[in-house]
Amino acid sequence: MVLLIDNYDSFVYNLARYLEELGVEVEVIRNDAVTVAEVVERRPEAVVISPGPCGPGHAGISVDLVRASLGQVPILGVCLGHQVLASATGGAVVRATRPVHGQVARIDHDQGGASASGLFSGIESPLTATRYHSLVVDPETLGDEWRVTARADGGLVMAMAHTRHVAFGVQFHPESVLTVSGHRLLWNFLCAADVVSGPMPVVPDPAPAAQGHHDAVSLGHYRSESIFPDTEDLSSNGLHW
């Protein structure tokens, strides 16, 4: 099972749909409806941290979850989730010089291959992708545990890969209908996480340019839970994967 942390963003169900189209079970839980300990009890095969309308400091359990699970379970952060990964490991998230919302951009990446950034394996560079964000990760604050693997014009960080663990962040939206090779990127993550193997299944063509600000889809049949936590220390102390 892949656990998808919902940071109150309508893109989350696009992510869930793409992952299910790749043949995996997805459980969607909002960032304030579960504790870190409860996530550990679920023993997900991988964790995906969704986009959201806020900064990492207001993303519910997301930062604490990364601190507790990095190196224990594979993690993919998308947009806000990408920023959460940086923030949880000491990186700075700063305001972008120019916010972009719904902009299709060319993303230059490192072509993946056998390196830690295999997220881009089989995907042409530059990649056409959709960006919705006002904040960016400051690459000067990442240290040597993260490697920047993709950039936009001006050198803005668009993706990073952890140098020791299976953890990746992407600032853009692979689940947007205007992003090319979004399914492939998610499949590469699932392969790196050992959730799937072999050739990628045939998936539906993305829908025409979506109606709405966030290319949102119906909640449909995806499983979403509200598990209201009592007051609890969200640190990783005492948690065992």
Q: What positions do the PLM features span?
A:
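Flexible gly/pro-rich beta->alpha loop and the following alpha-helix that scaffold active-site loops
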Residues: V2-I5, D9-G77, D194
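Short gly/ser/thr-rich secondary-structure transition/capping motifs
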Residues: E27-A33, D108-H109, Y132, A150-D153
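Proline-centered loop/turn at the N-terminus of a beta-strand
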Residues: M1, P74-L76, A92, T128, ...
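Phosphate-binding/catalytic loops
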Residues: I5, Q171-V180
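Cysteine-nucleophile active-site neighborhood
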Residues: R43-S121, L186
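Catalytic beta-strand/loop cores that center a nucleophilic Ser/Cys/Thr
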Residues: G113-R164
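Acyltransferase
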Residues: V177-W241
